[in-house]
Amino acid sequence: MVGFVPLLIEDVRTQGSREAIRRFAHVVYVLVPGLVFGYLIMGLVWPWSIMEPGHPFQALTYFSHFFEKPWKEMFDGALVSVPDMPWSYLPTLFALQLPEILLALLFAGVVGTFMSLSRVDVTARRKTIFLMLTLAASLPLVIAMVKRPALYNGIRHFVFVIPPMAVLAGASFAWGMNWLKNNHRRWQPAALAVFTFGLLLPLSEMIRLHPYEYTHFNHIAGTVRGADKMFMLDYWGLALKQASDGLREELVERQEFPPLGRKWKVAVCGPQRPAQVALGPDFTIGWDSQSADFAMTLGEFYCKGLTAPVMVEIKRDDVVFARVYDIRGRAISTLLAIPAP
Protein backbone atom coordinates (compact mmCIF):
# COMPACT_ATOMS: atom_id res chain seq x y z
CA MET A 1 0.00 0.00 0.00
CA VAL A 2 2.96 2.33 0.58
CA GLY A 3 3.65 2.21 -3.13
CA PHE A 4 0.32 3.96 -3.81
CA VAL A 5 1.33 7.04 -1.78
CA PRO A 6 2.73 9.10 -4.72
CA LEU A 7 -0.43 8.42 -6.74
CA LEU A 8 -2.67 9.24 -3.77
CA ILE A 9 -0.83 12.51 -3.12
CA GLU A 10 -1.14 13.49 -6.77
CA ASP A 11 -4.86 12.70 -6.75
CA VAL A 12 -5.40 14.78 -3.60
CA ARG A 13 -3.57 17.70 -5.23
CA THR A 14 -5.42 17.53 -8.54
CA GLN A 15 -8.80 15.92 -7.73
CA GLY A 16 -9.40 16.81 -4.10
CA SER A 17 -9.44 14.61 -0.99
CA ARG A 18 -12.88 13.09 -1.49
CA GLU A 19 -12.26 12.06 -5.10
CA ALA A 20 -8.78 10.78 -4.24
CA ILE A 21 -10.18 8.56 -1.47
CA ARG A 22 -12.94 7.32 -3.79
CA ARG A 23 -10.41 6.40 -6.48
CA PHE A 24 -8.18 4.68 -3.92
CA ALA A 25 -11.14 2.67 -2.59
CA HIS A 26 -11.97 1.65 -6.15
CA VAL A 27 -8.41 0.36 -6.63
CA VAL A 28 -8.72 -1.70 -3.45
CA TYR A 29 -12.09 -3.00 -4.65
CA VAL A 30 -10.77 -4.23 -8.01
CA LEU A 31 -7.97 -6.05 -6.18
CA VAL A 32 -10.47 -8.13 -4.16
CA PRO A 33 -10.93 -10.80 -6.90
CA GLY A 34 -7.17 -11.28 -6.88
CA LEU A 35 -7.24 -11.91 -3.13
CA VAL A 36 -10.07 -14.42 -3.54
CA PHE A 37 -8.22 -16.19 -6.33
CA GLY A 38 -5.06 -16.26 -4.22
CA TYR A 39 -7.03 -17.78 -1.33
CA LEU A 40 -8.34 -20.54 -3.61
CA ILE A 41 -4.85 -21.29 -4.91
CA MET A 42 -3.61 -21.45 -1.31
CA GLY A 43 -6.32 -24.01 -0.62
CA LEU A 44 -5.24 -26.16 -3.56
CA VAL A 45 -1.58 -26.29 -2.59
CA TRP A 46 -2.14 -26.17 1.20
CA PRO A 47 -5.58 -27.70 2.00
CA TRP A 48 -5.09 -27.41 5.77
CA SER A 49 -5.08 -23.61 5.47
CA ILE A 50 -8.76 -23.41 4.47
CA MET A 51 -10.15 -26.20 6.66
CA GLU A 52 -10.89 -23.55 9.31
CA PRO A 53 -10.94 -19.74 8.94
CA GLY A 54 -8.33 -19.24 11.63
CA HIS A 55 -5.76 -21.68 10.25
CA PRO A 56 -3.72 -19.12 8.27
CA PHE A 57 -3.39 -16.94 11.38
CA GLN A 58 -2.55 -19.99 13.49
CA ALA A 59 0.18 -20.91 11.00
CA LEU A 60 1.45 -17.33 10.99
CA THR A 61 1.87 -17.45 14.76
CA TYR A 62 3.40 -20.94 14.76
CA PHE A 63 5.93 -20.38 12.01
CA SER A 64 6.96 -16.95 13.32
CA HIS A 65 9.03 -18.82 15.92
CA PHE A 66 11.85 -21.24 15.13
CA PHE A 67 10.51 -24.62 16.21
CA GLU A 68 13.31 -27.01 15.19
CA LYS A 69 16.41 -28.06 17.07
CA PRO A 70 19.04 -25.46 16.10
CA TRP A 71 21.95 -26.48 13.91
CA LYS A 72 24.92 -24.63 12.48
CA GLU A 73 25.68 -23.61 8.93
CA MET A 74 28.71 -22.10 7.24
CA PHE A 75 28.48 -18.36 6.71
CA ASP A 76 31.42 -16.17 5.76
CA GLY A 77 33.87 -18.87 6.80
CA ALA A 78 32.42 -19.41 10.29
CA LEU A 79 29.95 -21.89 11.75
CA VAL A 80 26.89 -19.98 12.93
CA SER A 81 23.75 -21.30 14.61
CA VAL A 82 20.81 -20.66 12.26
CA PRO A 83 18.76 -18.68 14.85
CA ASP A 84 21.79 -16.43 15.38
CA MET A 85 22.62 -15.51 11.79
CA PRO A 86 23.80 -11.88 11.55
CA TRP A 87 21.73 -9.18 9.87
CA SER A 88 24.23 -9.23 7.00
CA TYR A 89 23.31 -12.81 5.99
CA LEU A 90 20.80 -11.93 3.28
CA PRO A 91 22.47 -8.83 1.79
CA THR A 92 25.78 -10.69 1.66
CA LEU A 93 24.39 -13.73 -0.12
CA PHE A 94 22.28 -11.69 -2.53
CA ALA A 95 25.36 -9.63 -3.39
CA LEU A 96 27.46 -12.76 -3.93
CA GLN A 97 24.94 -14.97 -5.72
CA LEU A 98 23.02 -12.69 -8.06
CA PRO A 99 24.57 -11.96 -11.48
CA GLU A 100 26.80 -8.90 -11.52
CA ILE A 101 24.83 -7.17 -14.27
CA LEU A 102 21.60 -7.60 -12.29
CA LEU A 103 23.20 -6.07 -9.19
CA ALA A 104 24.50 -3.05 -11.11
CA LEU A 105 21.21 -2.35 -12.89
CA LEU A 106 19.21 -3.01 -9.71
CA PHE A 107 21.30 -0.46 -7.79
CA ALA A 108 20.73 2.08 -10.55
CA GLY A 109 17.01 1.32 -10.52
CA VAL A 110 16.66 1.79 -6.75
CA VAL A 111 18.62 5.06 -6.79
CA GLY A 112 16.62 6.29 -9.77
CA THR A 113 13.34 5.42 -8.05
CA PHE A 114 14.06 7.49 -4.95
CA MET A 115 15.48 10.36 -7.00
CA SER A 116 12.32 10.44 -9.11
CA LEU A 117 10.07 10.94 -6.06
CA SER A 118 11.09 14.60 -5.79
CA ARG A 119 10.97 15.34 -9.52
CA VAL A 120 7.95 17.17 -10.89
CA ASP A 121 8.58 16.01 -14.46
CA VAL A 122 7.93 12.36 -13.50
CA THR A 123 4.26 11.37 -13.42
CA ALA A 124 2.69 10.07 -10.20
CA ARG A 125 1.75 6.87 -12.00
CA ARG A 126 5.38 6.22 -12.94
CA LYS A 127 6.56 7.03 -9.41
CA THR A 128 4.01 4.59 -7.99
CA ILE A 129 5.02 1.77 -10.33
CA PHE A 130 8.71 2.06 -9.56
CA LEU A 131 8.20 2.58 -5.83
CA MET A 132 6.06 -0.57 -5.67
CA LEU A 133 8.74 -2.52 -7.56
CA THR A 134 11.46 -1.20 -5.25
CA LEU A 135 9.49 -2.06 -2.12
CA ALA A 136 8.58 -5.52 -3.45
CA ALA A 137 12.27 -6.18 -4.08
CA SER A 138 13.68 -4.73 -0.87
CA LEU A 139 11.11 -4.53 1.93
CA PRO A 140 11.06 -8.29 2.77
CA LEU A 141 14.86 -8.23 3.03
CA VAL A 142 14.84 -5.13 5.24
CA ILE A 143 12.23 -6.69 7.55
CA ALA A 144 14.32 -9.88 7.84
CA MET A 145 17.45 -7.84 8.57
CA VAL A 146 15.64 -5.99 11.37
CA LYS A 147 13.68 -8.93 12.84
CA ARG A 148 16.55 -11.44 12.37
CA PRO A 149 14.61 -14.72 12.18
CA ALA A 150 16.35 -18.07 11.80
CA LEU A 151 18.05 -18.05 8.39
CA TYR A 152 19.54 -20.98 6.51
CA ASN A 153 19.96 -22.58 3.07
CA GLY A 154 21.10 -19.35 1.44
CA ILE A 155 18.53 -17.15 -0.29
CA ARG A 156 16.04 -19.86 -1.22
CA HIS A 157 13.37 -18.60 1.19
CA PHE A 158 13.55 -15.16 -0.43
CA VAL A 159 13.64 -15.98 -4.14
CA PHE A 160 10.23 -14.30 -4.48
CA VAL A 161 11.98 -10.91 -4.41
CA ILE A 162 14.09 -11.73 -7.48
CA PRO A 163 11.31 -11.20 -10.11
CA PRO A 164 10.66 -7.56 -9.02
CA MET A 165 14.43 -7.09 -8.85
CA ALA A 166 14.74 -8.30 -12.44
CA VAL A 167 11.88 -6.06 -13.64
CA LEU A 168 13.41 -3.03 -11.91
CA ALA A 169 16.82 -3.83 -13.38
CA GLY A 170 15.31 -4.24 -16.85
CA ALA A 171 13.51 -0.89 -16.57
CA SER A 172 16.78 0.69 -15.47
CA PHE A 173 18.56 -0.68 -18.54
CA ALA A 174 15.75 0.50 -20.83
CA TRP A 175 15.90 3.99 -19.33
CA GLY A 176 19.68 4.05 -19.73
CA MET A 177 19.50 3.03 -23.39
CA ASN A 178 16.83 5.65 -24.04
CA TRP A 179 18.97 8.33 -22.37
CA LEU A 180 21.95 7.35 -24.50
CA LYS A 181 19.76 7.47 -27.61
CA ASN A 182 18.82 11.07 -26.85
CA ASN A 183 22.19 12.29 -25.57
CA HIS A 184 25.09 10.02 -26.64
CA ARG A 185 23.79 7.79 -29.40
CA ARG A 186 27.25 6.57 -30.42
CA TRP A 187 27.71 5.01 -26.97
CA GLN A 188 24.71 2.72 -27.36
CA PRO A 189 26.62 -0.16 -29.05
CA ALA A 190 29.22 -0.11 -26.25
CA ALA A 191 26.49 -0.18 -23.59
CA LEU A 192 24.76 -3.05 -25.38
CA ALA A 193 28.07 -4.95 -25.58
CA VAL A 194 28.63 -4.49 -21.83
CA PHE A 195 25.08 -5.67 -21.16
CA THR A 196 25.57 -8.75 -23.37
CA PHE A 197 28.84 -9.56 -21.61
CA GLY A 198 27.05 -9.19 -18.28
CA LEU A 199 24.48 -11.78 -19.39
CA LEU A 200 27.08 -14.20 -20.73
CA LEU A 201 29.12 -14.10 -17.51
CA PRO A 202 26.58 -15.95 -15.30
CA LEU A 203 25.49 -18.08 -18.26
CA SER A 204 29.00 -19.49 -18.62
CA GLU A 205 29.05 -20.25 -14.89
CA MET A 206 25.67 -21.99 -15.11
CA ILE A 207 26.93 -24.18 -17.95
CA ARG A 208 29.96 -25.20 -15.89
CA LEU A 209 27.80 -25.95 -12.84
CA HIS A 210 25.00 -27.86 -14.59
CA PRO A 211 22.92 -29.47 -13.13
CA TYR A 212 23.82 -27.65 -9.90
CA GLU A 213 23.03 -24.12 -11.07
CA TYR A 214 21.44 -23.25 -7.72
CA THR A 215 24.92 -23.30 -6.14
CA HIS A 216 26.01 -20.34 -8.32
CA PHE A 217 28.22 -17.64 -6.83
CA ASN A 218 29.26 -14.67 -8.92
CA HIS A 219 32.76 -13.36 -9.63
CA ILE A 220 32.56 -10.95 -6.69
CA ALA A 221 32.65 -14.07 -4.50
CA GLY A 222 35.26 -15.72 -6.72
CA THR A 223 32.67 -18.15 -8.17
CA VAL A 224 32.04 -21.45 -6.37
CA ARG A 225 35.80 -21.90 -6.02
CA GLY A 226 36.06 -18.84 -3.82
CA ALA A 227 32.83 -19.55 -1.98
CA ASP A 228 33.50 -23.24 -1.27
CA LYS A 229 35.16 -22.78 2.12
CA MET A 230 33.12 -19.71 3.05
CA PHE A 231 29.51 -20.71 2.38
CA MET A 232 27.36 -23.77 1.83
CA LEU A 233 26.91 -24.76 -1.81
CA ASP A 234 24.94 -27.98 -2.39
CA TYR A 235 22.85 -27.86 0.80
CA TRP A 236 20.12 -30.02 -0.77
CA GLY A 237 22.61 -32.75 -1.64
CA LEU A 238 21.69 -32.90 -5.33
CA ALA A 239 25.16 -34.22 -6.19
CA LEU A 240 24.39 -37.40 -4.25
CA LYS A 241 22.13 -38.48 -7.09
CA GLN A 242 24.98 -38.32 -9.61
CA ALA A 243 27.32 -39.93 -7.09
CA SER A 244 24.83 -42.79 -6.64
CA ASP A 245 24.58 -43.29 -10.40
CA GLY A 246 28.37 -43.33 -10.56
CA LEU A 247 28.59 -45.97 -7.82
CA ARG A 248 26.13 -48.25 -9.60
CA GLU A 249 28.02 -47.87 -12.89
CA GLU A 250 31.35 -48.53 -11.19
CA LEU A 251 30.11 -51.73 -9.57
CA VAL A 252 28.70 -52.97 -12.88
CA GLU A 253 31.97 -52.19 -14.64
CA ARG A 254 33.94 -54.02 -11.96
CA GLN A 255 31.43 -56.88 -12.00
CA GLU A 256 31.18 -56.78 -8.22
CA PHE A 257 28.25 -58.15 -6.26
CA PRO A 258 27.21 -57.76 -2.62
CA PRO A 259 28.12 -60.45 -0.08
CA LEU A 260 25.79 -63.44 -0.14
CA GLY A 261 22.57 -62.93 1.75
CA ARG A 262 22.58 -59.14 2.03
CA LYS A 263 22.55 -55.90 0.07
CA TRP A 264 25.33 -53.38 -0.43
CA LYS A 265 25.54 -51.06 2.59
CA VAL A 266 26.17 -47.37 1.94
CA ALA A 267 26.81 -44.85 4.71
CA VAL A 268 25.71 -41.39 3.59
CA CYS A 269 26.85 -38.04 4.98
CA GLY A 270 24.28 -35.57 3.74
CA PRO A 271 20.59 -35.73 2.80
CA GLN A 272 19.93 -39.45 2.44
CA ARG A 273 16.81 -39.33 0.29
CA PRO A 274 18.55 -38.44 -3.02
CA ALA A 275 20.93 -41.38 -2.60
CA GLN A 276 18.17 -43.73 -1.49
CA VAL A 277 16.04 -43.00 -4.56
CA ALA A 278 18.96 -43.13 -7.00
CA LEU A 279 20.49 -46.35 -5.64
CA GLY A 280 17.20 -48.20 -5.43
CA PRO A 281 16.25 -51.36 -3.53
CA ASP A 282 19.57 -53.15 -4.05
CA PHE A 283 21.29 -50.92 -1.47
CA THR A 284 20.84 -50.29 2.24
CA ILE A 285 21.27 -46.63 3.20
CA GLY A 286 22.21 -45.37 6.65
CA TRP A 287 24.61 -43.38 8.83
CA ASP A 288 26.57 -46.33 10.23
CA SER A 289 29.98 -46.22 8.56
CA GLN A 290 31.49 -49.02 10.65
CA SER A 291 29.48 -51.77 8.95
CA ALA A 292 29.14 -50.10 5.54
CA ASP A 293 30.79 -51.15 2.29
CA PHE A 294 30.86 -47.66 0.83
CA ALA A 295 30.75 -44.11 2.15
CA MET A 296 29.03 -41.36 0.20
CA THR A 297 29.88 -37.87 1.42
CA LEU A 298 28.68 -34.46 0.38
CA GLY A 299 31.36 -31.84 -0.22
CA GLU A 300 30.19 -29.70 2.68
CA PHE A 301 31.86 -28.64 5.90
CA TYR A 302 30.12 -31.25 8.05
CA CYS A 303 31.41 -34.28 6.09
CA LYS A 304 34.86 -35.76 6.62
CA GLY A 305 37.40 -36.29 3.91
CA LEU A 306 38.31 -39.98 4.25
CA THR A 307 41.62 -41.75 3.70
CA ALA A 308 40.11 -44.47 1.54
CA PRO A 309 40.02 -45.27 -2.19
CA VAL A 310 37.78 -42.85 -4.08
CA MET A 311 35.40 -44.69 -6.40
CA VAL A 312 33.37 -41.72 -7.64
CA GLU A 313 34.06 -37.99 -7.50
CA ILE A 314 31.61 -35.29 -8.57
CA LYS A 315 33.31 -31.97 -9.31
CA ARG A 316 32.27 -28.68 -10.82
CA ASP A 317 34.68 -25.81 -11.47
CA ASP A 318 37.39 -27.66 -9.48
CA VAL A 319 35.10 -27.92 -6.43
CA VAL A 320 34.23 -31.35 -5.03
CA PHE A 321 30.46 -31.68 -4.66
CA ALA A 322 30.38 -35.35 -3.59
CA ARG A 323 32.56 -38.45 -3.28
CA VAL A 324 32.02 -42.17 -2.91
CA TYR A 325 34.69 -44.09 -0.98
CA ASP A 326 35.36 -47.81 -0.81
CA ILE A 327 35.60 -48.40 2.94
CA ARG A 328 35.44 -52.19 2.96
CA GLY A 329 37.85 -53.52 5.58
CA ARG A 330 38.37 -50.08 7.13
CA ALA A 331 37.30 -48.87 10.55
CA ILE A 332 35.54 -45.56 9.92
CA SER A 333 33.93 -44.43 13.15
CA THR A 334 31.94 -41.51 11.70
CA LEU A 335 31.48 -39.54 8.50
CA LEU A 336 30.77 -36.30 10.34
CA ALA A 337 33.47 -33.67 10.70
CA ILE A 338 31.51 -31.99 13.51
CA PRO A 339 29.23 -33.43 16.22
CA ALA A 340 25.62 -33.99 15.18
CA PRO A 341 23.21 -31.25 16.39
Predicted segment positions?
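Cytosolic-side transmembrane helix boundary signature
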Residues: L8-E19, L168-A193
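Hydrophobic/aromatic-rich transmembrane helices and adjacent perimembrane loops
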Residues: T92, L96-F107, Y152-M177
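Catalytic lumenal/periplasmic loop and adjoining terminal transmembrane helix
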Residues: W46-M51, P56-F66, P149-L151, R186-I332
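Hydrophobic alpha-helix feature that most strongly marks membrane-spanning transmembrane helices
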Residues: L96, M115, K147, M165, ...
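Conserved, well-structured beta-alpha core segment at the onset of a catalytic domain
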Residues: A20-I21, A144-K147, I155-V159, V167, ...
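Transmembrane-lumen/periplasm boundary regions of multi-pass, lipid-linked membrane glycan transferases
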Residues: G3-L151, F197-D245, R323, A340
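Short, low-complexity, Pro/Ser/Thr/Gly-rich segments in the mature regions of secreted, periplasmic
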Residues: T334-A340
